[in-house]
Amino acid sequence: MAFRKENKVKSFTRIFISLASSDNILAQSSGEVLKPETINYRTYRPERDGLFCERIFGPIKDYECHCGKYKRIRYKGVVCDRCGVEVTEKRVRRERMGHIQLVVPVVHIWYFRSLPNKIGYLLGLSSKKLDAIIYYERFVVIQPGITDKKVCDLLSEEEYLEVLDGLPVENQRLDDINPDKFIAKMGGEAIYDLLSRLELDSLSYELRHKIDNDTSQQRKIDALKRLQVIESFRSSKNKNRPEWMVIGVIPVIPPELRPLIPLDGGRFAASDVNDLYRRVIIRNNRLKRLIDIDAPDVILRNEKRMLQEAVDSLFDNSRKSSAVKTDANRPLKSLSDSLKGKQGRFRQNLLGKRVDYSARSVIVVGPELKMHECGLPKGIAAELYKPFIIRKLMDRGVVKTVKSAKKLVDGRDPIIWDILEYVMKGHPVLLNRAPTLHRLSIQAFQPKLIEGKAIQLHPLSCTAFNADFDGDQMAVHLPLGNEAILEAQMLMLASHNILNPANGTPITIPSQDMVLGLFYITKMRRGAKGEGLKFYGTEEAIIAYNEGKVDIHAFVKVYVDDIDENGTPINHIIETSVGRVIVNGFVPKAVGFVNEELSKKSLRSVISDVIKTCGVSRTAQFLDDIKDLGYMMAFKGCLSFNLDNVIVPKEKETFVQEGYKEIEEILANYNMGIITYNERYNQIIDTWTHVNSRLSDALMKQLREDDQGFNPVFMMLESGARGSKEQIRQLSGMRGLMAKPQKSVMGGGQIIENPILSNFKEGLSVLEYFISTHGARKGLADTALKTADAGYLTRRLVDVSHNVIINEEDCGTLRGLIATELRKNEDVVVSLYERILGRVSVCDVQHPESRKIIVYAGEEISEDKALAIQNSSIERVEIRSVLTCESKKGVCVKCYGRNLATGSIVQIGEAVGVIAAQSIGEPGTQLTLRTFHVGGIASNIATESSVVSKYDGILEIDELRTVEVVDEINNRHLIVVSRLAEMRIIDTRTKIVLATYNIPYASKLFFNDRDEIKKGDLLFEWDAFNASIVSEVAGRFHLENVIENITYKNEYDEQTGLKEKVIIESRDKTKIPVIHILDENGEIRRIYNLPLGAHITKEEKDVIRVGEVLVKIPRTVGKTGDITGGLPRVTELFEARNPSNPAVVSEIDGEISFGKVKRGSREVIVTSKNGDYRTYLVSLSKQILVQENDYIRAGMPLSDGIIAPSDILAVNGPTAVQEYIVNEIQDVYRLQGVKINDKHFEVIVRQMMRKVEIIEAGDTKFVARQLVDRDEVSEENDHIWDKKVVVNVGDSSNVKQGQIITMRKLREENSILKRRDLRLIEVRDSIPATVMQILQGITRASLQTSSFISAASFQETAKVLNEAAIKGKVDKLVGMKENVICGRLIPAGTGLKEYDKIMVETTME
């Protein structure tokens, strides 16, 4: 028998998966397993022909046969004549397969138990019928012959025998190929015969015809599903046959992959797979015996069924209802289970391997280390660098053999320390802290030998690792190869990773004590020693300080070197302090003199400036210097606080009293019936929120003034070293409102009306303490749940985007996104500068006044250019974006723009997909699970109810309809009755829009269109607690269909004794409650619909004036808007889920009218100006936001609720939905104060929009409703563009009907036919496929990726693999996961193919 001598790894470029035929399995097998025995329990040697047989799988000892006749390597390759074992090494037992020859074929469980049911669709049988055939309950007709049965009819045994009795005797003697013979079988054999008789091509043609012509939607859908399975087989181009889903031979995996492990006491722990194989072999052998002795059919059938079940369990035990269990009642792990899940083959062994040359230990702080260093304990270092030390020991001739060198190292002989120092030079180590949430969780450091057993970590790299020194552990890894060492030094060294890849701001930034020290010495105070002194230079100032002549905080004048706005060096006198002079001694000259208090915020901008002007290495040095200075000064300043530093504001008592006064008024109003229960609740919450924020402001003011701002508590807060405003407010203000415990998760977080008025300094009462414990505990529980959720989000994000790599310089697209600044009301949330910085412009950007070009098309927008654009009156810039990039693979440099981690334009090969996923996933743990923070304190924002102008200017109002109202004191104002009204404030001089507002329905408006306004004018106000319906006409009030206890109920308030009519959902769907406004003659002038939960404020026959409120609809109680907060919202958006109560959205512009009521829904009809109309059904339980005759725009909601992303895509197109998703997710992160650059979200959203759905397949290879890559469709459409489809073959024998042929072939064929005077071929033009863009959630997008290996390692492993096998998929190994799994270099960074081709040569002088 031949065997491989060299163990050379074959290089491969793609991996192909398909069904295995019996011949394939036999070709790979080394022999048949005949016995169920594993090993002999007396001799512990494998049994012959058993599951561990040495003859089949190879010897268990190197170069030794079973019987011992041949031993030693010299017999290598000899097959023993006594025991039949080949003499070779024992590792072949890891790769040699065996097989089991089954007596009857069985059906593979994957193909009839997983959905969609492949065999069922191919044969057109339901799962139930299929099970009846496979498990030997029914016969199935395979060939009807001369009977009246049809193919695939099921027969019970009686019916089968009846049919046989009715047939002439000779029928059964006919040959199977004879179409007259009646054949019916059951079990695997029947399925095998049926599948092998399928004609896929003609079946495909029939189904396509049926889809085109069938009238019933359901039949169409069924045919489509069948067609998809059939097309899968056809697309695998004869590599797959349907009958291979039935197996006659089962492969046996190598014994070392299912080992027997001896335990103490002579017992064995066997792998579960062995048990499953044993059951198959036992049943198979029993069946053989029964057939040999001609057992009756009933017994045979039962045994065959048991064999089918045994094979099912072997392949996939978890899919069966009656899984095979062990004695301990645990289901056995089958072959499928060993691939699935976190513990499966993919994720446990292929994507995450344990590696050699690694160590882990506790970390401690190393304040005297340099930025690029870490302290490595001697014990760890000696072990890690062992081979290098041994080599050096031998080179230097200290020892002769490896063994003795090993002894020296293990004995920690003093001689090895010098050698270790030498070996470690220029050989960095990698430090990693779990959880590795982003790429900065693994960084390279140059190790320094230290005593002790803990690793020392530089304090500035803690932020990146998210490490603290309360017992965290870190792992050390050693890069071995020269390339690896070089990459660690050039790319991963900690001093090179100063910027955060998520947003480009410095991440190695002093924190805690360092900040406190720097803040302390750059703070100035009046009246300090030496105030007003003048120094001619910085040295003199420092000498004076050292001599004790001047205080470090004193205001002094110093002559310093500085830099003006244009960056030219100047010298001038400035007022500063000695502390700031000392700090500036370390600041690079090119940055100028930093004359400000250094808090965490200002330090960040100083460090950014240093990086921009001086580069990374100088920044690293600067960071080290200010780290040392910060620690020194925190120590010198003795900054700790005592109880007296925690100041309780003087005004607290008065604020609280005022709060109580307001609440008395609210309760009085409530008791008089002026306001409803909900309004009372909302107003009370509002009052306390207001008191709390006033108290916070007073507290901050007082702390700031205390001891000239040198109050230690205030300094810790102000510098950003420790604590937050919220925490200080609780220490010395009041704890404020608390959240109610939720009975269920959906219970909604209500707020307890009575706030905790005490603070921690005064101490809480027992009741207050009890209320606050709830919040504290909930916080801990939430954190634990949140971590898992955030980790799973990151995993899905990486999976969807791991193959987005920068692959080319420029894709040449002409498209881009319009970037504008983002505003909420009039506050700028994100400036235009931030949005365009580091992007590439699509077209030339001209300055509007000077007409000078600021940025050319295709040029990166740098800081100064972005600033120039921001300062000009340009409002929008078209920038290149990943979303519009047209690269076939990955994205291009120009569309991505700047790499935030380096601050320069991105390089080809950068793995931007993974970086995006990490940047979004890493802050995930900081997002809230719900809407409350700080020990359960309710952060309910005081509700706004009016808009005051912040600018002078002119008003522009669009889409406005108003009615004029005169109130009791004869003041006139306008009430807005349109839903689309938008107000803009325009600068009178430059005509720039300063602010934009949407005016809510039913607002009071105080100005008209084109009015001039001044800063501080009240523009409009509205009722924040109620939505209302306003009458647009005067007349009499009349209620229609408002019937007690059917469409409304009286809500009786015990405290006030007042009744209110509240609309409820009626059982009788024909009765729709409406308000009619009647004129004098009783004619209806207007109709208003009443939504659920509406409170009717008027009585029957009341006289109604224009602009009066008819109905109030209370907004939900005390919830901060109707928002899903934090992580769940992010997940909802990334998964592109439709919200639970989606709004109904209009697809066209038009006027509203109402139709009939159908099945609990109201018809809303939108009619456009050209007469085109759409009808929408809005459920009666929803509030309809529009009234009769309103004019609305496409994309506007007709009912309340959140607009679903799929609607935005359908109505406003892909760009709108992309922007919507990016902005919505950004909102969640911004709320938590997390800054992430837009381009990361764009990368993910691009991956969500990769696929299109085929609407009409035309003449392409696709099937309707199939999801296909956009590029694939355009390729296929281009391919059939100028081809023809044969309609009539004429007299030609070379073409078939429906075949696609080229014009050339058509001309050739027809000219031949013409010469012979035969009928010509008739053709029509080919029809390309039409598609619709779809939006996929990240999970679906990951599973739909073109690489089946990547999809299988993500989720639903079995399903992904069995669909890939049927299609005969090829994995071209383009993404990262596939390459990691195959053990190759990833195709990104330095592993990119382009970099392999680089030749290095020396230039001759």
From Swiss-Prot:
| CDD domains (UniProt xref) | RNAP_beta'_C, RNAP_beta'_N
Question: Which amino acids does the record list as binding Mg(2+)?
Answer: D468, D470, D472
Q: Which domain of life is it from?
A: Bacteria
Q: What class of enzyme is it?
A: transferase
Q: Which residues are Zn(2+) 2-binding?
A: C811, C885, C892, C895
One short Pfam name that applies is RNA_pol_Rpb1_4
Spell out the GO cellular component terms annotated for this protein, sorted alphabetically and separated by semicolons: DNA-directed RNA polymerase complex
Q: What is its EC number?
A: 2.7.7.6
Please list the GO terms describing molecular function: DNA binding; DNA-directed RNA polymerase activity; magnesium ion binding; zinc ion binding
InterPro entries documented for this protein: DNA-dir_RpoC_beta_prime, DNA-dir_RpoC_beta_prime_bact, RNA_pol_asu, RNA_pol_N, RNA_pol_Rpb1_1, RNA_pol_Rpb1_3, RNA_pol_Rpb1_3_sf, RNA_pol_Rpb1_4
List the SMART domains: RPOLA_N
Q: Which GO terms describe its biological process?
A: DNA-templated transcription
Tell me the cofactor note: Binds 1 Mg(2+) ion per subunit.
Q: How does it assemble?
A: The RNAP catalytic core consists of 2 alpha, 1 beta, 1 beta' and 1 omega subunit. When a sigma factor is associated with the core the holoenzyme is formed, which can initiate transcription.
**What's the stated role of this polypeptide?**
DNA-dependent RNA polymerase catalyzes the transcription of DNA into RNA using the four ribonucleoside triphosphates as substrates.
Which family does the record assign?
Belongs to the RNA polymerase beta' chain family.
Q: What is this protein called?
A: DNA-directed RNA polymerase subunit beta'
Q: Gene encoding this chain?
A: rpoC
